[in-house]
Amino acid sequence: MIINNFKKLIEENKSMLNELTLGLFEDSIRCFDAGIYRQAYLLAYQGFTQYIRNIVRDAKMPTGYDPNKWNSVQAKLKNEKEFDEQVFTCIQQKSCPTGTPPVVAILDMPDTLRNDFTFWRNRRNDCAHYKAYDINASHVLAFYSMLNQYMLKITVEGGMKYLLREFKDAFDPAKTSPKESIQPLVDKILLMVHPSEMNDFFDGLQSATSFH
């Protein structure tokens, strides 16, 4: 069931969410359970926006990205009045290596998902401004389903690379106790790695842990 999967996603990945993001998602779930669907959608959207805001703010500049533009992105993400629009821009920005100058995407995510996000944003606007558009459980569940499938896969470096780095750190005794379980990382594989990347992931995993 979509709602139960979303609850599980949030509960099992609290360490990846800051207090504000976690609170927004938890409040969204409470509203959904109470049948308050407009607010449930709005809070889930805000939670996702905060999640993207944080991962971009905490990331290193993507390879090939213009430093001045990166500084501008970071400044807007820190501004409470500008971050929402900047998050949307980050999501929409596609790579165009043949452009003049070449364009580097900030977020590693499917272009189809970038295109779909205009729909999600429009529904957010419907919720926020109480427009005539009827927001019901199906809209909230559709958004939850998208989050279940893609949220942890979306990073600046890509979900696969991010998870490989976490595995590398987990097997490094200078960073992680040998007694610490890697099961939480194993549980993230299906959430963060696209099926088409699995072979590359396991090749990378062998390389990342081979020095041990």
Please place each PLM-identified region on the residue numbering.
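Charged alpha-helical initiation segments
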Residues: 1-40, 172
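Short alpha-helix boundary/capping elements
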Residues: 48-56
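Short, glycine/acidic-rich hinge or "gate" loops at secondary-structure transitions
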Residues: 59-68, 165
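Solvent-exposed, non-transmembrane interaction/regulatory regions
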Residues: 72-73
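Charge-enriched, short contiguous segments at helix-coil
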Residues: 103-162
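Polyanionic, low-complexity intrinsically disordered segments
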Residues: 142, 149-212
